[in-house]
Amino acid sequence: MLQEWKAMEKPEEEEIRARLAAAKEKLAKQQLLIKEQKIPVLVLMEGWGTAGKGSVIGQVIQNIDPRFFKVESMGEKSEEECRKPFLYRYFRRIPEEGKFVFLDSGWMDEIVKDELHGKLSDEDYAKRIESVRRFERQLTDNGYLVMKFFLHIPEKEQAKRIGHLEHEKDTVWRVSKNDLWQNRHYEKCEEAFSSYMKNTNMPSAPWYIIDAKSRKWTELQVLETLTQGIEIALSNQKLAVPLLQNVFPLVQMPLLSEVPLDKEIETDEYRKELKELQNRLGELHNRLYRKKVPVIIAYEGWDAAGKGGNIKRIAGALD
């Protein structure tokens, strides 16, 4: 997408100032309607290192009541997060009804980094892309407004900004190893970003590429796009978009009427088999723990059918 993208013509400074004032006023009014209509707004701010993601978020939130927003900057994963599905830590940070959450780099950044540094096989990368598509679709199906921005700057502009930051002792800390790596491998990163955006660009959650060479022009593009998205969401909360088909393989189960209820087992045989199976389950549990495989066991059934007792016997085999 980045290779085909063409930047809009930048307006004169006077026009930028006038449009900025109008966009800020519009967002200040819209936040109250967002609260009234209980629409959750998730803003993903992605882009190149030194493109100004944090700065533009800082400018946008000045127009929103502090009670109505949170800004999340994702650091290294905790031990708990490493054991959960990779989207788990992002799901925990999604906004509640009527509020905004701004993600200063999110799941795109994580996936593309892992893919570029060889931490994901082609198969794992494809699975993550599909997980993202389903996750974002799940959010929009449940009334979320998902706005995805990518701040784009040319290779020379990024190198120039890195040089300026490194020149001052008070700003050198802002240049990360990843920023330097990106600039050295700009074309490779550009291709990876483009591929990711192409694969996750959906009608219900499209990508907005922002020309980030100028700070005020960047702010104006983000604000105008955000307010347009909010305006559409306020007038049409339920977007008419088709549901994705379920592609998960399902185990064929018999109908309830086909399940035999007359089977019995002798007490001694039951106790013997139960002990053997509990021992086997304990061994499998240890293997699952070593391989960090999460397991969910769900119980349904008639009242007094023995769900609680069965859970106790299963749990008795586990640490």
Set out the residue ranges of the language-model regions.
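Glycine-rich phosphate-binding loop of ATP-dependent small-molecule kinases
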Residues: 1-319
